[in-house]
Amino acid sequence: LILGGGSNFLFTEDFDGTVLYPLMSGIEIVDENQDEVWVRVGAGVVWDDFVAWAVEHGYGGVENLSLIPGHVGAAPVQNIGAYGVEAKDTLCRVEVIDLEKACKVTIEAADCRLAYRNSIFKQEWKNKYVVTYVVFCLDKQPVFKLGYGSIRQELEKTGEQLGLKQIREAVIRIRKAKLPEVSEVPSAGSFFKNPVVAEVIGR
């Protein structure tokens, strides 16, 4: 069993087996140009710590994903998403260890078959690879994604100038209002999938 932060996992009984728990740390810039920056993040980094780092440095693309629980290594596996943004929007490549061949492999985002809360890591490659590092491509001149109604409404309440920090804080307020602190009200969290229907039905 490969386990990250433990979100989206609910054990109903003891697990009698081996658990792999990636602890790779670190956030480093590996390349950049005038408009974009490529950031390599350890699989063991808490996801929201990475988002906070990106916002602090003025890099856009993941601010809408603030306060999502779990570790960075799970981002490409689950293709995490919220408020109109998904991991696939910024994912560049994934560094893994092939458990069968005991070697390092780099997988491009295009080969991860990223879909709504899904990827090839949850299908054919389940338990085949352990994610060690993930490389994201972030924007130096971010375009804010405010299509999700509640974010825009929350921002209008404060009247502050629009920026990465303000969007992150708005998302955090929204998420905290929906679910109490686990330390106060213990729970398995909130995990769900919206139904996917044909476009003709959606109309």
Residues covered by each model-derived region:
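Phosphate/pyrophosphate- and phosphate-bearing ligand-binding catalytic cores of soluble enzymes
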Residues: K104-R203
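Anion-binding (especially nucleotide phosphate/pyrophosphate-binding) glycine-rich loop
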Residues: L1-E100
